[in-house]
């Protein structure tokens, strides 16, 4: 399985920033990458809220794998952010 060099919170925040800036979503920038690089930090609180919501798997997710592992993985992602001061 590939492993990202970015934290999960940063990846979520970058997606949210991209949606706000990119012409392919809600924004008007045809080349939003630089804006995303500059502004993704503004979306960290939203990303944390999304991740907190995902702590508990739904029934389909629980049936597909180990719910305890899922919860530990999400908590680990949140704890990384606490360690760097974002949570």
Model region roles, listed by residue range:
Residues 36, 43-46:
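Extracellular ligand-binding/catalytic regions of CAZymes and related secreted enzymes
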Residues 77-83:
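Structured N-terminal alpha/beta-domain signature
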Residues 46-49, 76:
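A generic structural signal for solvent-exposed, polar alpha-helical segments
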Residues 2-35, 49-70, 84-87:
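Amphipathic alpha-helical oligomerization segments
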Residues 39-42, 64-72, 76:
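Cystatin/cathelin-like cysteine-protease inhibitor module
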